[in-house]
């Protein structure tokens, strides 16, 4: 961290529980919880598409979320909202907000507070691999929860809505969608139920509360997530991440992240892979931070971090 970064970090350590970071073009709002105990690195919890950092602060049924759980474990916790999400400003061209632009804003946050553990979910996975390669001094470890792989691993899908629609049930491709980039994408409730709130662990009695938390998404981000037209976020060389501790965690009820897909991402990146049923944890879908055993999975991640001395 340079002198300016160190000064900023000292200021943040005395700041109230929220602040703004990111790039000039794409500022991001950040919640800050807890205080670091000796020897424990801060952790940054990054949400996926259609969500905000609120998914880490509390669960849909009102229990404490992963952010307070990590704070109780003795870590300083930072929870950003992507640009244009939650309390982060939305520009008029939000529909074409790219993965790289979001990653650059998150990279700026890590440069201010790092080195840190970076925990990512779903569509923020490709951003984590990119940030770790671009700014390795800021990322001490990565925990990927059902994370998207780098586009290096994804087949190039045609930039054709009709052709992609024929692949929408192909779990090996992540059940892809292709959307027009002339307006933000509003996620319909039936999509949420099919892919995000589908598991037996999801608190279905709180689905309406969850639905109200979902925000419009950049159409370009969605297309990049499925490597439509080969425009997904790539890394230059997985060897650049070979010395980085990486954990990938996946449940058995996530149609967009079957075991084979996330295991392949782990092999490519040299990561440790946890298929939750092998730890006696069954029934989790795409949103384990919201599900009824969220504390159990948070404890698994905390134990991994502590075993690594992070």
Kindly give the residue locations of the regions a language model identified.
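N-terminal cap/lid segment of alpha/beta-hydrolase-fold proteins
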Residues: 2-37
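Active-site glycine-rich loops that stabilize anionic/oxyanionic intermediates
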Residues: 47-60, 122-123, 252-253
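Glycine-rich "HGGG/HGxG" loop immediately N-terminal to the catalytic nucleophile
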Residues: 54, 80-96, 282-283
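Conserved alpha/beta-hydrolase
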Residues: 61-90
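Conserved acidic catalytic loop of the alpha/beta-hydrolase fold
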Residues: 100-117
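Conserved hydrolase catalytic core segment
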Residues: 115-156
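Alpha/beta-hydrolase
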Residues: 159-261, 271-275
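Catalytic histidine-centered segment of alpha/beta-hydrolase-like enzymes
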Residues: 279-294
């Amino acid at each position: 961290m340079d002198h300016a970064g160190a000064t900023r970090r000292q200021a943040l350590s005395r700041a109230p529980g929220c602040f703004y970071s990111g790039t000039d073009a794409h500022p991001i709002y950040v919640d800050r919880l807890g205080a670091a105990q000796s020897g424990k690195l801060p952790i940054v919890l990054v949400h996926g598409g259609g969500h905000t950092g609120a998914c880490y602060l509390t669960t849909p049924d009102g229990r404490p979320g992963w952010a307070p759980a990590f704070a109780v474990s003795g870590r300083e916790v930072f929870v950003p909202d992507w640009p244009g999400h939650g309390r982060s400003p939305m520009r008029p061209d939000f529909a074409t907000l790219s993965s790289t632009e979001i990653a650059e804003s998150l990279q700026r946050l890590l440069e201010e507070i790092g080195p840190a553990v970076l925990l990512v979910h779903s569509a923020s996975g490709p951003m984590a691999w990119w940030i770790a390669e671009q700014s390795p001094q800021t990322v001490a470890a990565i925990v990927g929860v059902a994370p998207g792989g780098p586009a290096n691993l994804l087949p190039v899908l045609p930039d054709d809505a009709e052709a992609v629609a024929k692949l929408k049930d192909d779990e090996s491709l992540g059940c892809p969608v292709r959307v027009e980039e002339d307006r933000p994408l509003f996620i319909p409730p039936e999509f949420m139920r099919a892919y995000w709130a589908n598991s037996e662990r999801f608190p279905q009695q709180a689905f309406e509360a969850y639905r109200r938390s979902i925000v419009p998404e950049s159409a370009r981000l969605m297309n990049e997530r499925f490597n439509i037209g080969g425009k997904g976020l790539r890394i230059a060389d997985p060897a650049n991440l070979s010395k980085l501790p990486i954990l990938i965690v996946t449940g058995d009820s996530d149609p967009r992240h079957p075991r084979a897909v996330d295991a392949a991402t782990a092999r490519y990146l040299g990561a440790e892979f946890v298929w939750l049923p092998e730890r006696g944890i069954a029934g989790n879908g795409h949103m384990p931070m919201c599900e009824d055993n969220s504390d159990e999975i948070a404890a698994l991640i905390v134990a991994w971090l502590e075993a690594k001395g992070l």
